[in-house]
Regions:
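A nucleotide- and high-energy phosphate-metabolite-utilizing enzyme signature
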Residues: 1-301
């Protein structure tokens, strides 16, 4: 037996002892546990004949357990943990998009609909409990749709089905929490944006915080060529080579709003919120993003 075997079995024992959630996964997936003991961290109990929604949820359970054991055993470093969790989110989102299109137009090619990963998913930094914040876009000219259906109507129905596949809960849990509020004016805009209108908006009307949202963006799922075309088109907006006084004032105002929103007067001491308190994780993150917005257009490094 190798050193890795003892590290893995010890990690499984500790997980079962100290985590109710992981103990439940271990008890429900004995075959998966035995595979992990052999060093196979890419194993899954998914069967092809299963409904897609169930396959996704079982795949999510397998990823949660394999990554946790790899993490606890020391065989995965932090980069590998977040990479695997982010790669799963990409894969699940892609499957959900293709399924939603195929359910409505079985004979059509799955194209014309893309998901852009932002934030931690965009930079392959998802953690165990992260939700995802994609922006969904579509091409009216290539999106498959039924009969007399308008492109926007088809896109919104596909988008709703994607969210349903990922968020619906049953005895197997759920796949991912999905937050679509990073799109422009989410209270009045459809959940899926036509690509040309989205490009026009970001080129002419978007605010500094919307630029910041795209710092880590990438085409993650669906029609990736469409997603990449969109990102290429708005790149000059995100990474400006020059800033006028209005842009500087806007960035400064964003910085002040962030501090006011997250710090809430909190100082170090009992009850301090490490994530949202003054000088905490969120404020440090936005500090870095502000400097990226200022300098990134002239210094890509």
């Amino acid at each position: 037996m190798t050193d890795d075997f003892f590290k893995i079995t010890d990690a499984i024992d500790r997980a079962a002892l100290h985590s109710t959630f992981l103990k439940g996964l271990i008890d429900r997936q004995p075959a998966l546990v035995e595979a992990i003991k052999t060093g196979n961290f890419d194993v899954s109990e998914v069967e092809e004949e299963m409904p897609v929604a169930r396959r996704l949820r079982l795949d999510r359970r397998a990823v949660a357990l394999t990554v946790a054991i790899g993490d606890l055993s020391g065989l995965f470093d932090l980069t590998e943990v977040t990479r695997r969790l982010s790669a799963f989110a990409d894969r699940a989102l892609d499957i959900a998009i293709r399924t939603a299109i195929a359910e409505r137009t079985p004979d059509a090619e799955s194209k014309g609909f893309a998901a852009l990963a932002l934030g931690k998913q965009g930079s392959f930094e998802l953690n165990y409990s992260s939700d995802i914040d994609p922006i969904l876009i579509y091409d009216p000219d290539t999106l498959p749709r039924r009969g007399r259906e308008e492109p926007e109507e088809a896109a919104v129905r596909i988008g709703r089905r994607v969210v349903e596949l990922l968020q619906a809960r049953d005895a197997d849990g759920y796949v991912l929490r999905v937050d679509l509020r990073l799109r422009p004016s989410p209270e009045i805009t459809p959940i899926v944006l036509p690509v040309d209108a989205a490009i026009s908006y970001y080129e002419s009307q978007a605010l500094a915080w919307e630029r910041a949202a795209f710092i880590r963006a990438r085409a993650a799922a669906g029609d990736r060529a469409l997603g990449q075309r969109f990102l290429d088109e708005i790149s000059p907006f995100v990474w400006r080579r020059g800033l006028d006084f209005g842009a500087v004032r806007e960035i400064r105002a964003m910085s002040h709003r962030i501090r006011d929103h997250y710090s809430a007067g909190q100082l170090f001491g009992p009850g301090y919120d490490l994530k949202r308190g003054r000088g905490g994780i969120r404020e440090a993150e936005f500090f870095a993003q502000i400097h990226q917005l200022i300098h990134g257009g002239r210094d890509p490094s």
